[in-house]
Amino acid sequence: KPSLLKEKDNVEDYADILKNLVELKLVGGETLAIKENYDLMQLAVDLDVSKNMSLRITTNGTLTPKFGGKDVFDYIPHFKDCQMTVSIEFWGEKNNYIRFPSKWGVTLENARKFADCPRTRVMFATTVNALTIGYLPEIADGVYELRKEYESNDLWSWASGSLVWGAGNEYAVTSVPLDIREMYMDKYFEYGDFMKKEFEEWKKLYYYLQDMPFDEELHKEMMTNIQLRDKHRGTCLTDVFPEWEPYYEKL
């Protein structure tokens, strides 16, 4: 049988690659919980080549552990520049529901710490799915508010990221009932800053709601999945998103 155990990388084997690298991109699982990512950054520093490369890290922003006595904040200053992409689903406490058991306060605090690092920009990124699509403008508004606190406007950015799509993917936008879509579409017109500053993005998301066909079977699968997950976690979808109440039955 094939082994399910991960073979241990010998990071030293990547020395020749690092010497010629212009961008080091680290991803997860949870990127900042993987020791080998720190070993790679340390090797780049030891080889004196980190100053020549851009560092790109995608993280949930939920933790910043130390490995060998150092955390990510110790490594960022050694690189030419850095972009931290913080993966979220909602702006604010709503994020705690999907990204259970994360805490929004911790995520935002870490994002601010990333932004305080030298030559570092922070991007918030999310997927476009049945639960998030009605609230994505709130992420844009949250980023606009953050920009007001900092001298550089390009320090903070956001991206709506990947559209959840494909056969059998119950969290696709096609699972959203038409009455909820109407509510979300009306709500989109309340986000004047987002509409004005990023109209093409606003229009793309609005048209997803308007044009994607409703799939009743996929919707039922999604609701079953949500109800089972809520039962396991001790959470409740409609406590956070009351618009789903007509379609939700607590198990």
Across the structure, where does each feature detected by a protein language model lie?
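Core AdoMet radical
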Residues: 1-8, 18-36, 47-68, 75-109, ...
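A short acidic, amphipathic alpha-helical/loop segment
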Residues: 13, 36-43, 68-75, 97, ...
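Short, acidic, metal-binding catalytic loop of nucleotide-sugar glycosyltransferases
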Residues: 43-48, 117
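General structural signal for secondary-structure boundaries
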Residues: 1, 15, 177-178
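Short, basic/hydrophobic alpha-helical segments
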Residues: 9-16, 112-116
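Conserved C-terminal portion of the radical SAM core fold
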Residues: 77-85, 103-248
